[in-house]
């Protein structure tokens, strides 16, 4: 079984950060992200998923080359055609919106711009640790 890899973006507004975008799933808030297609790089995957799930295109954002976040956690293999559990890799890039854009919701129940007011308690599995890692990164940069 090949390790599932999911890639996405944390999209922020403002400099310094004023807010960040999360997508509403039926039971949780999450990033615009998805699985890498064959022949696709991780960054290409993240950009494709961002466009598909929000309507935000590469020209709308400025990717921060100094930050990326990786997390690994166990998921049921039945989602990927197997049995038992398998380790999944999540890779998240940071990008700032250059200009206001209209969010087009295609695969979720909605979206929300959350205010940047650490500490955040939104979703234990991935979002909270991503935001904590970004907060530490920003403190080191200043």
What are these regions (language model features)?
Residues 36-127:
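Unchanged
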Residues 27-28, 119:
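Short, solvent-exposed loop/turn segments at secondary-structure junctions
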Residues 30-34:
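A short gly/proline-enriched turn/hairpin at secondary-structure junctions
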Residues 4-6, 26, 85-90:
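Short connector loops at helix/strand junctions that flank enzyme active sites
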Residues 21-24:
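Short, acidic/hydrophobic/Gly-rich beta-strand patch recurrent on exposed beta strands
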Residues 120-142:
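Charged phosphate-binding loop/patch that engages nucleotide di/tri-phosphates or the phosphate backbone
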Residues 1-19:
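Conserved N-terminal beta-strand and adjoining loop/helix that marks the start
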